[in-house]
Amino acid sequence: MSVSALSSTRLPGSFSGFLQAAALLGLLLLLLKAAQLYLRRQWLLRALQQFPCPPSHWLLGHSREFPIDSELQQVLKRVEKFPSACPRWLWGSELFLICYDPDYMKTILGRSDPKARVSYSFLAPWIGYGLLLLEGQTWFQHRRMLTPAFHYDILKPYVGLMVDSVQVMLDKLEKLARKDAPLEIYEHVSLMTLETIMKCAFSHQGSVQLESRTSKSYIQAVRELSDLALQRVRNVFHQSDFLYRLSPEGRLSHRACQLAHEHTDRVIQQRKAQLQQEGELEKVRRKRRLDFLDVLLFAKMENGSSLSDQDLRAEVDTFMFEGHDTTASGISWIFYALATHPEHQHRCREEIQGLLGDGASITWEHLDKMPYTTMCIKEALRLYPPVPGVGSKLSSPVTFPDGRSLPKGIIITLSIYGLHHNPKVWPNPEVFDPSRFAPGSARHSHAFLPFSGGSRNCIGKQFAMNELKVAVALTLVRFELLPDPTRVPIPITRLVLKSKNGIHLRLRKLH
């Protein structure tokens, strides 16, 4: 018999042996991974033994108790039953501690822990490593670089731009309101806040609301990316970037990222083209203060280098999203709160009419002269905080004021929604009571956190408050807001606070 014939008869046996070896290796790796997950679960159980929680499934965690669209309601049940904080198991080997006590908030926000990778890193393909995702010295450099873009001298002329954008929205709503049918207002408010941020921070010319096709595509992309990010956090099989890219959700996320980036790239290129026009560059350089995008374009890092294109777009993507979606959430929920509490709406309207007189528009000087309206805005932000929660990962052990402690490596979620609805912090928390924010009223320094707190609080919080006041004031002097009793909004958590079924209101023209 030839050698080749002998070799061919042995090949099946050799291949079978290879398969057996591969199967054994795979089984060994699987057992090692299972042992690793088991040991991590045991470590987490010991680390969190001071923090009781409802029983969890060894594999599914608390996922069955936290359906994606009733998550906030489940958090409130924990707030009532477990003091200060409660663990939530995402799955068998991953959990985070939900905190909703002001002392716990103060402790965590006073630290410099990094963001929790299990949630925030999933945003990187979309918004890049801008101010939201950066850590350490690089974050500090970017924060210091961008702070001048929110100086008093910059914010003051923005009020006129805010007024223009709100008036365009109200003109559109007036035409739609003639049909005397309830309107879903969130999309209209989103287009208005997107136009505002593009005019104020990115030197955009024209009206996003009137030329809204591409802007609607961007807003739709933001909505999809927000939904997909939350779904990914909750799916153990989507933690791997490789597996996620292969999934239908991963492909949808990639396409939505492309749409969002096309929008921000267009904004950057338009501003660069404007700066090439004769005299424009010198005009900008003579400004005492630069707006947000110009700060980025003219920025010099500490080593003398300009901001890279990648870093520039990350900051633009971050602020384009945060600068419009959070304020859209805030304004929409404020409108709903006032619609369902007509006595407070009426008192706000009287205050604003007394301030503005007949036909006058709102200016910078008016913003600090509407105390009751400001109280109502803050109470609505308490009930409906635009950002329901923020997360971090402990970089060192921590001991809380009640004596309980945690080791390094635990993920912390600060539930701002839970804090704002905590009856031990806010008596009768579901009651809309603007007097909580009356001048001179006392409360814990970390009981009210609509813009987070600590060194990483919202850099644009004053910009946002100004926009909320302008939108509320101009809307109330033009319309009476009425609820749609057949469609009560259901708060759900995405990246910002949304409504599962939209926010529907009837607008009745005044005069």
Swiss-Prot record:
Can the keyword Methyltransferase be found in this entry's annotation? no
Give the UniProt keywords, A-Z. Endoplasmic reticulum, Heme, Iron, Membrane, Metal-binding, Microsome, Monooxygenase, NADP, Oxidoreductase
**Which cofactors are named for this entry?**
heme
Binding residues for heme: 322, 458
Q: Does the keyword Oxidoreductase apply?
A: yes
Q: Which Pfam families match?
A: p450
Its Gene Ontology biological processes?
lipid metabolic process
Q: Which Gene3D superfamilies match?
A: Cytochrome P450
Question: Propeptide spans which residues?
Answer: 1-4
Q: Which GO terms describe its molecular function?
A: heme binding; iron ion binding; long-chain fatty acid omega-hydroxylase activity
Q: What does this protein do?
A: Cytochromes P450 are a group of heme-thiolate monooxygenases. In liver microsomes, this enzyme is involved in an NADPH-dependent electron transport pathway. It oxidizes a variety of structurally unrelated compounds, including steroids, fatty acids, and xenobiotics. The kidney P-450 system is rather specialized for the omega-hydroxylation of fatty acids. Both P450-KA1 and P450-KA2 catalyze the omega- and (omega-1)-hydroxylation of various fatty acids with no drug-metabolizing activity, and hydroxylate prostaglandin A1 and A2 solely at the omega-position.
Write the protein's name. Cytochrome P450 4A7
What is the gene name? CYP4A7
